[in-house]
Amino acid sequence: MTTQKSMKFEQFNDGIVTICEIDDDGNVGTRKEKLRFTEKTVGYNRYYEAMTAKVQIDKLIRVPHRNWLTTEYLAVIGSDVYEIHQVQTLSETLPKTTALSLHLTRQRRLNNGKF
């Protein structure tokens, strides 16, 4: 007998993240796409596992799934620039969702301080 997985409907109502390419100087380059997101809590285990790997996770968000979305992009929320440290596809949600582990960076910046 097969059982059906329960699907969770994901809402993206916490804000908008802009996914951008990285320019030649390592800063925010060409805007790829704006996506709505929902923010999740960075759990105790995830936080300390990241710290033991010498990676700091400042924010965990979920966005609608995009096949092209990798760690080769930057995420901009408001005026804050984040490096994408992990991209994880969640198939048990409707619609299909991608979880992004983000690190707030102070070395990277917006070109001319704005979009």
List the predicted regions and their residue ranges:
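Active-site-proximal polar cores
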Residues: M1-G26
